[in-house]
Design a protein with these regions (language model features):
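Sequence-level preference for short, compositionally simple segments enriched
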Residues: 109, 113-484
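Sec-dependent bacterial lipoprotein signal peptides
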Residues: 1-21
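Generic alpha-helix initiation/capping and coil-helix boundary signal
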Residues: 7-14, 29, 173, 329, ...
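Ser/Thr-rich, Pro/Gly/Ala-heavy low-complexity intrinsically disordered linkers and tails
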Residues: 23-112
């Protein structure tokens, strides 16, 4: 990218003054926050597979004096605590660390922790499980539709798939991934198409257009590193006017690829699934003077599943978009591996990384450090990025306490005055992210893991001149956590 659930009902005079100031100017990238200085290349398997059963924190009774612990269990963070008895009264259904109790106030109540490192309470966390996070989609203006989508089983057992098409450099039904996808689109219909990709390296840019039928793209090997789709476009790379960048984001009038156009793989079709693959953007950003954003995977569709998929890059590795700011589109990443250094998990989509390894690369940023997540969630959407049951690891040689968990990407905003104007209008980004029940390595900053936004909106977990940031944690462990 480029270098709340709480809403304000009225704006302070200072904010109104900013709003009246207005401002102009284009975002440095067509689709990402302006990053810290950058440079780099691209690898491993998650330690804890999604779906492994982890015990939730004890639930808490809901009566004023109810603090009795309930039993808690979870699989993907969705088990509920069994209402514990309060000290003299009955608890109202305690929530496990990843569970749904009978009550709860979302993020309307007070968090725990510190102002700089807020922690969700058990009741608040109950509203932010995998299934709660993904249960709704649609248009914010007309009201989201609850379809209770449950993708936690993943893409399925590849041993039971019968391929419609096969891709192999030595010759299957197709020699490139894109040609097989094109064939699936041309065939039409609504039945799922299975495309098996043989082990090997495929150097190409791939687009799954919105017109595609449901597609499952997979390799048979559980070693995702054996099947690699890679390319090296980046934001500032020049291109001829009239030439398409990524076909899913053609940017024909542009003279550079732009962030969205840099994507190695773009998935724009609903119900797309991928399993046992590596998708990489291997731009050497250290050799690039500007426009370093280089996306590996970009999505802009609903009900997407990526299982055992490795995503390699540096800045802007994983970009989850929506067709527009008012649309909620969902994606689920199970047992994945994502690496990068600046804003490398970002976008305004609603998505979950479950049982993943998220690895920070230090070679390019050095002592400067970087940011892991950069959500640009619409302020009306309570669910942006959820990282759960995952491991945040780090490349050897990274100093302790160097890296931020993230920052809000104020997408489409040029500066604080522009942001203030957007807030006054009621349509504005306020990135939402929760990292919970995960293990944080020593590279994470202990006291202040959340940075100011991409337009320098100061981080604050309470509303003031600007809306409160929506960046929280819950029940994390490890040397980089709030309770190491």
């Amino acid at each position: 990218m480029n270098s709340k659930s709480r809403r304000i009902l009225s704006l302070p005079l200072a904010l109104l003054a900013l709003a009246l100031a207005g401002c102009g100017g284009d975002d440095a990238s067509d689709g990402g926050p302006a990053g810290a200085s950058s440079s780099g290349g691209g690898s491993a398997a998650p330690d804890a597979p999604s779906g492994s059963t982890t015990g939730g924190d004890p639930g808490f009774g809901g009566s004023p004096s109810g603090e009795g612990a309930g039993t808690a269990s979870s699989s993907t963070g969705d088990g509920s605590g069994a209402g514990g008895a309060g000290a003299g009264g009955s608890g109202a259904g305690g929530a496990g660390a990843g569970g749904s109790g009978t009550g709860g106030s979302g993020l309307d109540g007070s968090t725990t922790g510190t102002e700089a490192r807020p922690q969700l309470t058990g009741a608040q966390a109950a509203h932010h499980t995998v299934l709660k996070h993904l249960e709704k989609a649609g248009e914010l203006a007309s009201g989201l539709v609850t379809d209770s989508w449950d993708p936690t089983a993943g893409a399925g057992d590849v041993g039971g798939f019968t391929p419609t098409y096969t891709v192999a450099a030595s010759g299957g039904t197709h020699r490139t991934v894109q040609s097989a996808i094109d064939a699936a689109v041309a065939s039409g219909g609504a039945r799922r198409v299975y495309i098996e990709v043989a082990s090997g390296a495929y150097r190409e840019v791939v687009c799954v257009p919105s017109s595609a039928p449901p597609i499952t793209l997979y390799s048979k090997s559980a070693d995702a590193s054996r099947t690699v789709i890679a390319y090296n476009n980046h934001n500032g790379k020049t291109k001829e006017t009239g030439k398409a960048a990524n076909p899913c984001n053609a940017n024909l009038s542009g003279t550079t690829y732009g962030t969205s156009g840099s994507a190695t793989f773009a998935a724009y079709a609903d119900d797309f699934q991928a399993k046992n693959l590596t998708i990489a953007n291997d731009t050497d950003e250290r050799a690039v003077s500007g426009g370093k954003q280089a996306v590996a995977l970009m999505t802009q569709a609903d009900r997407l599943i990526f299982e055992n998929v490795r995503l390699l890059g540096n800045q802007d590795t994983l970009y989850v978009k929506t067709p527009n700011a008012g649309t909620v589109s969902r994606a689920y990443f199970k047992g994945c591996y994502v690496e990068g250094d600046v804003d490398f998990i970002f976008g305004r989509g609603t998505f979950v990384l479950d049982g993943c390894t998220i690895r920070y690369l230090t070679a390019r940023q050095g002592a400067t450090g970087g940011y892991i997540v950069a959500p640009s969630t619409d302020a009306r959407n309570d669910h942006g990025i959820l990282i759960i049951n995952s491991d945040l690891t780090v490349e050897a040689g990274t100093p302790d306490g160097l890296v931020y968990l993230g920052r809000a990407w104020d997408e489409g905003q040029n500066d604080l005055a522009t942001y203030a104007t957007s807030v006054a209008s009621g349509a504005y980004p306020n990135g939402q992210a929760i990292i919970r029940n995960s293990t944080l390595g020593p590279h994470i900053r202990a006291l202040d893991p959340w940075h100011a936004s991409t337009v320098s909106r100061p981080y604050s977990s309470t509303a003031g001149t600007y809306p409160a940031n929506r960046l929280h944690e819950h029940a994390n462990t490890g040397p980089g956590s709030a309770r190491p």
